[in-house]
Structures are given as C-alpha cells and as structure tokens.
Amino acid sequence: MSSSRPTQCSSSSSRTRQSSRARILAQTTLDAELNAEYEEYGDSFDYSKLVEAQRTTGPEQQARSEKVIAYLHHIQRAKLIQPFGCLLALDEKTFNVIALSENAPEMLTTVSHAVPSVDDPPKLRIGTNVWSLFTDPGATALQKALGFADVSLLNPILVQCKTSGKPFYAIVHRATGCLVVDFEPVKPTEFPATAAGALQSYKLAAKAISKIQSLPGGSMEVLCNTVVKELFDLTGYDRVMAYKFHEDDHGEVFAEITKPGLEPYLGLHYPATDIPQAARFLFMKNKVRMICDCRARSIKIIEDESLHLDISLCGSTLRAPHSCHLQYMENMNSIASLVMAVVVNENEDDDEVGADQPAQQQKRKKLWGLLVCHHESPRYVPFPLRYACEFLAQVFAVHVNKEFELERQVREKSILRMQTMLSDMLLRESSPLSIVSGTPNIMDLVKCDGAALLYGGKVWRLQNAPTESQIRDIAFWLSDVHRDSTGLSTDSLHDAGYPGAAALGDMICGMAVAKINSKDILFWFRSHTAAEIRWGGAKHDPSDKDDSRRMHPRLSFKAFLEVVKMKSLPWNDYEMDAIHSLQLILRGTLNDDIKPTRAASLDNQVGDLKLDGLAELQAVTSEMVRLMETATVPILAVDSNGLVNGWNQKVAELTGLRVDEAIGRHILTVVEESSVPVVQRMLYLALQGKEEKEVKFEVKTHGSKRDDGPVILVVNACASRDLHDHVVGVCFVAQDMTVHKLVMDKFTRVEGDYKAIIHNPSPLIPPIFGADEFGWCSEWNAAMTKLTGWHRDEVINKMLLGEVFDSTNASCLVKNKDAFVSLCILINSALAGDETEKAPFSFFDRNGKYIECLLSVNRKVNADGVITGVFCFIQVPSHELQHALHVQQASQQNALTKLKAYSYMRHAINNPLSGMLYSRKALKNTGLNEEQMKEVNVADSCHRQLNKILSDLDQDSVMNKSSCLDLEMVEFVLQDVFVAAVSQVLITCQGKGIRVSCNLPERYMKQTVYGDGVRLQQILSDFLFVSVKFSPVGGSVEISCSLTKNSIGENLHLIDLELRIKHQGKGVPADLLSQMYEDDNKEQSDEGMSLAVSRNLLRLMNGDVRHMREAGMSTFILSVELASAPAK
C-alpha cells in the first residue's frame, strides 16, 4: 500500500490513526468475505486460495456492507455458549430472567438426593426471579454486586443453589439492556472458598509478577520469554506463546515455551485474517478468553420472545467460539486454550497527557498482542486463576509500554546522531555525493537493503539497488504519476501501480523517496518481507502435499508468505520523519539563494534567548535560596567534596546542630554510622548526575536533642549545577519521618488501641486508610478526609480497588490504568505478606485537584499472626517542598528550552552557511587572481571553524575538562591559521584604530605541521579578540612566535610552538583571567567562557596559557604541541 507524503505533512500519530482506521475497515471487510465463504462451502472452504485473493482484490470489490453487518452481528450476538457453565440474562429493574441457556435449569435447579427438601423446587424459565434460586449469603452478595455501577467489580461471587446445594462462581457483566451472569461450577476441593473479588487472585500470580517486576528492562525478548515461562508454570498448559501484532496487523509468535515433544511455532508469521478484527475488538472488551474443549457441543440460548435485540455475549466468559476457529484448533491438535489480551498505549507523541489531567482524557489503547496457552486435552481453569492470569497480562502490558518508551528514546537518539553526521558531511562537501560515497551514508539513516541518488543527471547506487536504467525509469514514473508530491513511501511498488515492478523481482518491493528538487532524488529500497522471516518450526517435507483446505499453522505461514510475496516491511512514521528531515537539510544545502533576513531573525532570537534565560535564571536562583532558608522541611546541601554548605533552620531545629556548627563539616560526620554507606552511595551517584529519590537515612542529634535519638529523614537528592551544567554539589530535600516511625512502632506494639491513633485529629498523624483481607475499605481517618474531600462514611465498606480508587469510575481517580495496576501490586503484595517499599502515588481528590504523595503500605496482623488487612500511610510534601520541586522543574524546563533553542540554531545556521559555501565555491571557478583566491580561502577557514564550534553543541559539556572535544590530526600550514585568526578581529581593530602587527618568521609560517589547525585557529582568534577588546583606542596588538623541534624519529619531530599576543593598555581584568582558570565559576561571562574553552583545548593539545603584565603592556603566552611533516 503506497502513500505519498505532501510537503506540509500531518503529525505521525495522526497519520498512523488514519491509516490504522482504513486498514481495520479493509481487514474487517475481508474477514466478512472469508466468513461468508466458510459458511457457504463448509468442508470445501479453500483458506489458502481466499487469503491469497486479498492481494489481487481491490477494496471496492471487497465492499459488501450487508455481509460485514451480518458477520459482526453473528460474532457478537451468536446464541451459543460453551457447556462448562450456564448463563442467565436478567432484566436490570426486576432481576427476572429474560434469557437462559438450555442447560441452566439442569445445572441450577436439579434436586440433589443428598439435600432433602419439603418444598417444591423452583422452576427456572423466562420470567423467574433470580433471588429464588440461591441461598444466603450468596444471594445477598450477588444482589450487592448487581447494585454497583460496575457490576463486575466483585467477580467472582460465590453462590449456592437452593435445590442442589451446588456451589457456583457467578460472573456478572452488563450488556445492552440487561445483566448477563455466567455460572461456573466450583470444584469440591475449592469449596468453601473466599470469593472477594480481584484481591484474592493476586496471590496466585504473586511470584510471576515479582519476577517480571525484577527484570532490568531494555530487552523486549527477555520480557516476553519471562512472561510465557511464568504463565507456563502458573497454568500448566502444554504450550504458551506470546503473539505480537505488527503494524500491518499480521501476527508473529514472538516467544514460546512447550512441553517436550511438541512442534515449535516460534518465529511463525501468520496473516492478519487468522485473528479477525472483530475478534480483536472482543479481546479489547473482554481481556481473557477460555475454550475448554473445542470438540464439545455448544449450548443454545433461549430468549424472551418480546426482546427487540438478541442478547450480546461479548463480555461472557462462556461465549462459544466460531466454528471456523474450532476447526483450526482441531487441526493443530489444540483441544483447549486460554488467551489473554495485551493492551498498551498508542504511540502519540503529539497528544501527550499532562499529569494533572483526569483519567477520562488518557491515551488511546491498542492491542499489542496476545498471551496464548494451548493444551492437547480438555482443560478448565477456574475464574480466580484466570483473573490472576489477566492481572499478570496487565503487569506485562505496563512493562511493554516501558520498553516501547525506551526503544523510542534510543531510536530517536540514533536517528538524530545519524542526521547530525550526515548534515556535517553535507556542510563539508556542499554536495549530496558525500552522503552516498562516505561513511556513514544514507543507508544508515533507516533500515533498508539498498539506496540510490539521482543527482545532476547521474546515478549513484548502494548495495541492493535497482540498475541505473531501472532507477531512471522509476524517476520518470514519479515525475509522471506523483508529480505534485515531494516524496513517496510504499511497501509494494506493485500495489502502488509502478508498471516495472515485476521486472524488479522480489529483491526490490518497497521504496521510500525524497525529492530534493524536480530532478534530484534520493531513494531507499527494501526487499520482500519473506526475506526477513525464518520460521523455526519443523521443516516441511517437499514430497508431502499440503491440503490447502486444512487450516493449520503451516498453511497460515504459507498464506502469509503469499500475501507478502510482493511486499516489504512497511515504512514506519519515524523513519519517514527522518527521511523528510534529511530532505529539508539537502534542500537548504543546495539552495544558492541566501536569505539575509534569516540571519537577522536568528540574531534576534539569540538575543531574546539570552535576556529571557538570564532573567529566569536569576529569578530561580533567588527563589531557591529563599525557599531553602525559610522552608518548613529539612533541606541540606554539600559541595562536590561532601562538605556541608547548606543547613536550613528546620534541620538545625530537628538535630540541635546550629547552622554555623554544621557548615564546613563533612556530611558523613553528621549522619549515623549505619547510614554512612547509604549516604556515600547517594552522594557518589548525585555527583555523576544520577539523582536518587526516597532514600532513608538517619542524622545524629546534638545538644538538647541528643537524648531524643536520631532524626529519620526520607531524602530526594538534587544535583546542583553551575551555568555550564557541571555538577558542583548536591542538595538534599527531606521529609522528617521520625514521627511516622513512632506511629508505626506504636501500631506494631499496641493491640486494640490503633483506632485511637488513626482517628486522632493531631496534625502529626498522617492520612491513613486501610482495607480488610477481602479488599473492603475498613479505615479512613480524619486526615484522609481532609486530603481527599471524601468523608469516612462515603468510602467505608466499599471496594478499595475499584470503588474508592480506580482509573475510570471511583471516588478518587488515579491517573491511568498503569497507575491503577501499580497500586494493585503494592496493596496485594502487602496482603500476600511481602515487604513493600514506599512508592510514589497520585490521584484526583473530590474537587479534581491532583494530589502527589508517597504511599507506604503495611500489613495488619491479628494476635495469631494472620494477615487481616492492610494499613496505608500517605505522606504529602509540604507546600514549601512542593513549591521547591516546582521551581526545580521550571529550572529544568528552562534548561530544556535552551537546549531545544541551541538545536534549532545549529540547524538554522547550517543552511545559510551552506549557501555561503556554495557561493565561495562558485567564486573559485570565476578565474580569481592569487590575492582574491587568498581571501576566499580565509573565508573557507573561518567557515570550518564555525562548523567545528557548532558541532561542539553535541557534546555533553564543552567546559568539562574530561569531555572529549574532537581533535583532528591533519596537515596544515601555520600561515593559513594566523591569517584566518587575524581576519576575525580586523573589523573591530579598524573601529578602534588599533594596529595589528605580526612578528612571524617566514620559515615558521611556511612550515607544514600536523595537528588540529581549525582548533588552533579558534584558540588564537579568541585570545586576539580579548586582547583587542581591552586595548585602548589607537593602541597596538603584536603577535610573535617561537618554535622548537624535538626529534622522535628519522623524519618525525615534535614541535613546541609558543605564541605571544602582546597589547597595550591596562590589560585584561583580573576577574576575567580568574574565569579562564576556574571552570566552575558560577558568574562566568561570555569572554570568560570563551577563554576557558580555549584553555581546555590548549591542554588537550598538551599546552597551556599564561598571562603577564608589565608597564603599560600585557601578554598572553600560549604553548601548544604539534608534529612536523616528514621531510620531502
């Protein structure tokens, strides 16, 4: 499917959503066609032939709206269920039965001989009231669940039949116009059982969840292999797989584990039609699907004749599978299956949701894939274990989201780095030939098998590219058919309508194009998808003839290969964005129309940035100092040596150590011995720029506080940075946890008196809530009411997870589903007896205010040591701390804005520089005389210097002594360096009437040396500029040099070059000189920064700089080490 990219293109996520909708619509139509064919032909149904027809049948021919509607109705409202349970549909107002499965009367009302009864057993039919069928307390629990807005909250509900005494799991969900209840028999070994909703299922999956939580991250393969292994152990199925859906909706077995002896499916790819779009929609609604026995006869549903619509079974766990799917399972000897949906966030860079936005505005979701369990014999998994598997899949989905984000960051960084390198190559050569003939080249920008450049009527080919004549033919086709587009991407040249696609063969299927102009074009090529795919399954014997009518994984793989026979992997949006960016750079580089207004606009932006940035920085700095001094939370700071240089009044008050006594002490002398390793590690990481959060350590007390014991602090480390982003110290913003620990200790020691502590109105008591072992909210103190706005009687005896806290419909809404899953893990871990760490927690209060805090969950134990629930403590940062954090975030945002501005400036400067380079090259070809050519060469040298400085913006810190600024080892002539450096100050000299004289022996100037001439030119020009600036009007600047050779071989010498720049006047101010020698000076001026960078460069070149003053004169003495060229 081809897509051309217009010059003004929409956002990546918008394009993705549009293409996704079109693809789903087309795929659903094809699913309906296949279903109609299957229903019509039965055993004669030829799956392989019909799937292949997808490639040759256009969407207009496929459009059969009646078939699609009938197909979707059949999938969602088929009147069949599986026989392992029964089903009732109830009227929402009367709770009378309006539909039931044929086996319901037998399962729910058959009289058991073991249960004597004097009453007539109730008859189950249309109109029967459901409360007449079950005994208390099950009936009461069911009635309570049906009264909830989310009726599925308490699933499963344990009920017992009045007539037979048989126990059942009642699983409730809401359908259009009714309530649907699935009933599944409970095994005798499980009865009596506690059925308290989701909390009890967690214990079954606790080990698997802990394993996934402990993974280091950075590998999707490891994550998938781990989850299938844990599901294999948890469920006992013969085969467990992780299916991954690709961008074109085809599937892949991405991870697998089997019992010994089974044929592996790992690596198998299957067409999108294997899992229809309607089935994928149902997985989004009902995330767990179980088929107990594909050979069992389905049970019919009997409905009230007065119903206008058939009952929807979308949410039913009993819904019968489609006969086509049952046949597929039978053919692959998979008699039973259990499938969990993996639902993740869509990648929408332009639709980011802020932290303070309600949950209803969260990101769109998509089906990433499925976790699939197969068994070779009938197998039933009870609901609690199924729910545990669903919860495990949710945890897995959270980690998949994290892997996506990590992959996106790595990918973007790689593409930006490659774009920068290609852009630098273009700047040096001012011709696109450099990015196809050099290393790296355009093939390194995006994944491809070949590439080509059509430029100036000539063709350059890389690796698997079409022949020159074929490329010219493609270019002609583009100019004829896609004349108005600036580019094109397609995964199939055949489907895009290129007439020569057949001649290209399988090796060239996909293509991406970027037009530089109407005649010059960049091409990227991809081979067919099948070349990328190798199934690791059992090899096929060529002598065996497959039955194309027998649906089986091998046939799916064969059908998939037919579908993608003339297709490549699709071009992702981020790849096309990278190509488009390179296209813009090329257009700017080759554009000889220099626009002066661009430079003027850039100057204005630079000026505005400097003014705004300085004002913001001053405001932030003064505000931070004020906050630290007056904050009601403990704040302390140390320098890079660990010596205390900040100790606010709150710390002094808590520890008894006065500010003047603390300043200058080493941080390790003021903390308890047991906390020394923790603080050492925290300090070390912070000085490396890695800021730890929520670290607990103890501080010694002094004076009158000595007998109170150590102060317990929970600390966030914030690296203090100077103007050049160097870490010069660490600030510790803390929460005093001493009172909290006393409260916790009292909880541990005191039995029966905890309520007096919880409901104490003292402001020292933090917000506390709790739940019993079944998940019902059992505690909610006054501080919690004040924090949330919800009173105790409004939340007590509600489900803590689902009614009190949830991501969609609860008293306190959490940010999103991922946050809710994390809360579930935290509370369930405590209920399971695990130790839990303090964790960040956030939610919206009653008025929609976003609350950010820390949550500590602790198990509640009775006198016998049995866990009876959990207590949850909330720590809310003080207003001062919150404000300090907001100020810090503002500072970080300001720094980010500057970085983006630098990136923009670097990119924007490149284009006019390219135009200037083009003009100079054009001048060289106009027959200039020797003097004129010298002037052009000086301009070239200055251009290279500026380009080198721009490339420094990619360095983490140009001021860092240990940073690796690039130094080249190239051949150059000293005279060229001196002439170019002096030319940069001549305009300033003319304005001040300053004379520049060069006392440079000609034998030195003509010397050919090895080193970094551009960096030496940069150093010399910086020191010349400062010398001129601080020379009086009408003064003079003199440059001299001396050179010493030291032989290190027959033809090789080391050269010690000493340069002296002498100027009249009072000389350079002492403050500016100190800035040159002190890299960490917080008040460094532009000139000071320039001199400091130049000094660092000199030191990298085994040199340095000195400054001398004498009567009416000042001198910079620069030393640098070079190498001489071999004797010729």
From Swiss-Prot:
Which keywords annotate this record?
Answer: Chromophore, Photoreceptor protein, Receptor, Repeat, Sensory transduction, Transcription, Transcription regulation
Q: Please name one Pfam family that this protein belongs to.
A: HisKA
Any Gene Ontology biological process: detection of visible light
State if Transcription is listed as a keyword: yes
Q: Which organism is it from?
A: Oryza sativa subsp. japonica
Q: Name one GO molecular function term.
A: protein homodimerization activity
GAF domain span: 219-404
Entry superkingdom: Eukaryota
Subunit structure of this chain's protein: Homodimer.
UniProt GO cellular component terms: nucleus
Instruction: Identify the SMART domains for this entry.
Output: GAF, HATPase_c, HisKA, PAS
PTM comment for this protein? Contains one covalently linked phytochromobilin chromophore.
Histidine kinase domain ranges (all copies) = 904-1124
Repeat recorded as keyword: yes
Q: Which residues bind phytochromobilin?
A: 324
| Name the record gives this protein | Phytochrome A
Q: Where is the PAS domain?
A: 620-690, 750-834
InterPro entries given for it? Answer: GAF (IPR003018), GAF-like_dom_sf (IPR029016), HATPase_C_sf (IPR036890), His_kinase_dom (IPR005467), HisK_dim/P_dom (IPR003661), PAS (IPR000014), PAS-like_dom_sf (IPR035965), PAS_2 (IPR013654)
The entry sums up its family as follows: Belongs to the phytochrome family.
Query: PROSITE patterns attached here?
Result: HIS_KIN (PS50109), PAS (PS50112), PHYTOCHROME_1 (PS00245), PHYTOCHROME_2 (PS50046)
Q: Where is this region: Disordered?
A: 1-24
